[in-house]
Curated annotation (Swiss-Prot):
Pfam families per the UniProt record, alphabetical: TMEM169 (PF15052)
Keyword Transmembrane helix among record annotations: yes
Transmembrane segments: 160-180, 211-231
Protein name: Transmembrane protein 169
Stretch list, region Disordered: 1-84
Residues in the Extracellular compartment per record: 1-159, 232-297
Composition skew (Polar residues), residue ranges: 9-18
Keywords: Membrane, Transmembrane, Transmembrane helix
UniProt subcellular location: Membrane
Membrane topology: Multi-pass membrane protein
Gene Ontology, cellular component aspect: membrane
Length: 297
């Protein structure tokens, strides 16, 4: 009579295989939870890009004037809405409260696809929009004839000159690094052109010269641009100093590629915005309930 009870007691004890299976399932659930949390955190960390350039096709460029005469900038607004609504459905991109989404139209003047019309989708704050739509006459009126340029104040004076002197070695170092980086990319693009797209004689004559001259050329270019940027940033006012200090490379690589006839080798493209008063009009007729607006400059 005791043996069945003993057998029942033994049957209630969990087997080692059952325990290992439970541990494996628990570990799988933990890993699944961690991966899910990781994906959620990764989605939260993803932010909206500051600017996106969309290249226009030839048909869009040719049909621009009829489209404007019929419906104004309505196609651009629809394009901007489609561009925004897709990521917003995922809840990943959030527009800041004081920011607005605009579409700037311009032409590439230097770099790849020179002369092509582009639409730049960018998120700008109200302050940036005010600076963008500020008329040029107002900036000229502040310094008529250069008389007010030597005024003393919080934003201009000897203390600013002292600050620029202190920043001189820092600007030189940063400009040297940035120029070295863009110069290396430009050199590599030029090397690929002569090595892959030109004739065999270019490959055996120009490519070895480019390799041998790279250290000398890159050091001379980076040092010269660093010294030039350090000297140019010496200023009397904060605004002029900031305008000069934030442009580290001075557009030298793009200018060099345009002079050599190798615009596609430029490490960047320079877009000249088309002048328009559409942004100013949208600012004056701003709707508080409108989250997304597109304009053309």
């Amino acid at each position: 009579m005791e043996e069945p009870a003993l057998v029942e007691g033994q049957s209630q004890l969990p087997s080692p295989h059952h325990n290992s299976l439970r541990k494996a399932m628990a570990a799988a659930l933990v890993l699944d939870g961690e991966s899910t949390m990781g994906r959620r955190k990764k989605k939260k960390k993803e932010s909206r890009p500051e600017s996106i350039i969309i290249y226009r096709s030839e048909s869009e460029t040719l049909d621009e004037e009829p489209g404007e005469s019929e419906g104004g900038d309505q196609p651009k607004e629809e394009e901007g809405d489609d561009f925004i609504d897709y990521p917003m459905d995922d809840g990943v991109w959030n527009v800041p409260v004081d920011s607005r989404y605009v579409t700037l139209t311009g032409t590439i003047t230097r770099g790849k696809k020179k002369g092509q019309m582009v639409d730049i989708h960018v998120t700008l704050t109200e302050k940036e929009l005010q600076e963008l739509t500020k008329p040029k006459a107002s900036s000229r009126e502040t310094t008529p004839g250069g008389r007010k340029a030597c005024q003393l104040g919080a934003d201009r004076g000897p203390h600013v000159v002292l600050w620029t002197l202190v920043c001189l070695p820092v600007v030189f170092l940063l400009s040297f690094v940035v120029s070295f980086y863009y110069g290396t990319i430009t050199w590599y693009n030029i090397f690929l052109v002569y090595n892959e797209e030109r004739t065999f004689w270019h490959k055996i004559s120009c490519c070895p010269c480019l390799i041998l001259c790279y250290p000398v050329l890159i050091m001379a270019m980076a040092s010269s641009l660093g010294l030039y940027a350090a000297v140019v940033q010496l200023s009397w006012s904060w605004e002029a100093w900031w305008q000069a200090a934030r442009d580290m490379e001075k557009g030298f690589c793009g200018w060099l590629c345009s002079k050599l006839g190798l615009e596609d080798c430029s490490p960047y493209s320079i877009v000249e915005l088309l002048e328009s008063d559409n942004i100013s009009g949208n600012l004056s007729n701003k709707d508080a309930t409108q989250e997304i607006e597109t304009s053309a400059v």
